[in-house]
Amino acid sequence: KSLSEAKSICKEIGYPVLIKAAGGGGGKGMKIVEEEGKLESLFLTAKSEAKKFFNNDELYIEKYFKNPRHIEVQIMSGKNKTVQLGERDCSVQRRHQKLIEETPSPVITDDERKNLLEKTVKMVEQINYEGAGTVEYIYENGNFYFLEMNTRVQVEHPVTEVQTGIDIVKEQLWIAFTGETALKQSDINPRGHTIECRINAENPSLNFQPSPGTISVCHQPSGFRTRVDGSVF
């Protein structure tokens, strides 16, 4: 909440650090601080942006990794059990916003995957979570670092749906009504490789500035195992 508190935290975890808006998302209000001399100005800027975008100027600080991968695990959890639906690799980003999501991750080993999925299930079970959720991690040099848990159905959930054949929204509603998940871990049989690409209204000639306007022509891709989620027809 204060600059003095921020300095203390940064000293404890070591630079570089990432300052993030506590009530935010979508890459807004995020600042990378390479050294202590830059902390004050970036802290105040992040605080101002957090207030502007989210009406909440609280910030949190975490260790910044220079060459990380963003790996997340999809789970469905009820009073009876927790089931994992595999991981997604969301490392291709611009301005901290996801552009490409894929599963399985091309960078982690089978042993790393097994360990990650098992530990994620145990963590979710310990907090007695109910519903669909995504547990997010930073991965670097063979190590996973817990980032956050998104307690909702995420934009990239179709990647997992195509890969597993599981309707995540349907299962979320089932858990909401019954308190339990009808899935079994043995039901989850991922197949192939699935990639999702987000289409954004941006102008690449102007450093990807927002470029809203009327869509006059829309030709959507099609073909075997091709899925389009959107509001343009």
Regions found by a protein language model. Name each.
Residues 21, 26, 33-233:
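ATP-dependent carboxylate activation and anion-phosphoryl transfer catalytic cores
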Residues 1-29:
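A conserved helix-loop-beta module that forms one wall/lid of the active-site cleft
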